[in-house]
Amino acid sequence: MEREIDLQEVSDGRLYTSTDMVKLGCNDCSGCSECCRVVEDTIILDPYDISQLCQALETDFQGLLAGGRIELSVVEGVILPHLKLKEGRGGCTFLDSAGRCRIHDYRPGFCRMFPMGRIYENGDFRYFLQVHECPYPNKTQIKLKKWLGIPELARYEQFVKDWHFFLKDAERKLSEAENEEIPKRINLFLLQQFFQKPYGDAFYEAFYERLSEAGAVL
């Protein structure tokens, strides 16, 4: 999810890359699951996240919806999936009674990154540390790449950039639509193209093939 922020108010004033050391270490969140309990409907999922969740739960996109794991919402005119919260008291549905994540190895990029955020500019992005988000005391230095724990991180970060700026283009075209039917058709196409069709084992190859097809359509 995008936010308008003042970096000086929410961060330590630095911008990071994945090779930098950042004060994030928290002993694997031992005794704490605060960020998973107070979360709101703001964990927007990208195609990689959906692919990972489908693998973890051995299901497909429709299964995630029917199983109450995700919901759809409109973000800047684009319909996108987000994690669904527990009914009533809220919190992540993947948090177990011991305060641990049931899908930790497959968790979404937002969860992996927290309490880091991303700032996009000039076709690229860098990370920033949200200093008021994580209450865990006495954090230690850790390399951001290790904190993220994502295989083939360079490919993943390129995907993140390409997906972000593709969505920006889609948002612009949706906002310029001359009638209500055009956004409906585009959103249905995007859901089918990037989320409903399984990715299999070769996620990046499949994603970029679909991205090329979508670029030609839009």
Where are these regions (language model features)?
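Short loop/turn segments that flank or connect secondary-structure elements
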Residues: 1-218
